[in-house]
Structure formats: structure tokens, C-alpha cells
Amino acid sequence: MSEDVIAEIKRDYIYSLANQGDRADGRKFDEFRAISVETGVINKAEGSARVKIGDSQVVVGVKIQPGEPFPDTPDSGVIITNLELVPLASPTFESGPPREDAIELARVVDRGVRESGAIDLSKLCIESGQKVWMVFIDVHVLDHDGNLMDAASLGAIAALKATKIPNSKFGLGEDVKLPLNDVPIGVTAVNIGGAIMLDPSLDEESVAPCKLTVITNKEGAISGMQKSGVGTLTPDQINHIIRLAKEKANVLREKLEGIQ
């Protein structure tokens, strides 16, 4: 049986279940898979976290070092986000230059942190116009079974919550916690036959015409949105996803309570 035929059978099965109000793994449309968050997984990083959503797994490391500020923000720290799709994570991932989806993932993670004002960049100035703290967020995808957007964004903010500024390493005093103002959380949904499903599995992502990620802060304000795929969403569907994203973000945010 050809791969195209198998893919068509899979698609028909997932759409048939959706029409009946079901999903292949038995979850409700608005239900996430099991989530685990662990911090302090990389000893040499200033902060780190491992996040699993179902069988999807990411590890995030945060490194902080002094550097020059951008000319237009001489008194603000710098955020740089990178993401690597480790070849072992999926048969479709290959070594080499960053793939388009890796670049997209990195941008979504970066935008969620930056636009929400999660990090108080004004407190990362060491010497105005000369030296500031540069925050490097490195995301590594270890296993891909769908919804990498949410795993990566959750991993990034978990790692940042566990991060300390290495003042002592550079002769600048005692180490202190990275100043955070907010905890942005991303929630992703797909549209399958008119059914809106949160936390899509890899199979669901593969047959969905599009997906939408909504990142909200603690107050419920949207700090980022990203639509992927050529399919369309109606205004009612978008508003429904936004409502679900705000509700689920509060649940996911609880997973990060207690991180020091």
C-alpha cells in the first residue's frame, strides 16, 4: 500500500472521528495530553527546563552574558532565541541550515516573550549604551509528536523562571533572579472538519489545513498569534480559539508555579 493511500486513510479516519465528536486518542476537543515540566536539567546553563506534552519533548537552555545593547535601546537588555530540530526527533528532520518551520517556531517563542514584556529588559542594563545582559534562549526539540509550539513556549518561560543572572561570574556582585514581569503561555488549536481541537497530535497536525497559536499573558491580553497552513478560519472560530487559549493558559501556568 502506497504512502499516499495510507495518508488518505488516516485523514478520513481522523475526520470521521471529528464528525462524531471524538479524537483518535480519546481526548476531548479542548483537552491537552499529559504535561510534565522539569527545571535544572542543564547544569552549565543559567536556567533550563525539559517539557513533555504527550510524546513531544523539548529542552530549553538559557545563557546570559554581557554584550553591547542595540543602538535604539541603549539601556535595555537583549533577547536572542534559537531553535534546533534535532534529527533524532523525527524522520523528517535533517541536519543542516535551519528549516522554515524551525525559524517559525523560534520567532513565535521569541515574540511571546518579547511582546508580553515577560523579561524586564530595563533591569538588564549594566552600563548605559555600553554593556547590557544578553539573554540567549536555546530550544532543542528532542521528540516530535505534534504541538511543538506550545511545548517550546512553555519550556522557554519555565527555563526563564529558573534563570539567575551570573553577576559573580563577571565580577559584578551576587547572582540574582532574572527579573520577570509576566508568564506568557501559548495554546495551539487546529480546525479539522469544523471541529476546533487543542494540543494537536502529529497525526492531527498532518491532516489539518491550518493551525492557530495564541499567546496570552497573566491578564489574558494577547501578546502573540501565529497561523500556519493554507486553510482558513472563520471569525467565530478564531474567537472560539482565543477564548479557549485564555482558559487553558491559566491551567498551563499552574504547571510553572513553584519554579524558583
Swiss-Prot record:
Keywords: Cytoplasm, Exosome. GO terms for molecular function: mRNA 3'-UTR AU-rich region binding. The keyword RNA-binding does not apply. GO terms for cellular component: cytoplasmic exosome (RNase complex). Disulfide bonds: none annotated. InterPro entries: ExoRNase_PH_dom1 (IPR001247), ExoRNase_PH_dom2 (IPR015847), ExoRNase_PH_dom2_sf (IPR036345), Exosome_comp_Rrp42_subfam (IPR050590), PNPase/RNase_PH_dom_sf (IPR027408), Ribosomal_Su5_D2-typ_SF (IPR020568), Rrp42_archaea (IPR020869). CDD domains: RNase_PH_archRRP42. Pfam families: RNase_PH, RNase_PH_C. Its main location: cytoplasm. Component of the archaeal exosome complex. Forms a hexameric ring-like arrangement composed of 3 Rrp41-Rrp42 heterodimers. The hexameric ring associates with a trimer of Rrp4 and/or Csl4 subunits. Non-catalytic component of the exosome, which is a complex involved in RNA degradation. Contributes to the structuring of the Rrp41 active site. Belongs to the RNase PH family. Rrp42 subfamily. HAMAP family: Exosome_Rrp42. This is Exosome complex component Rrp42.
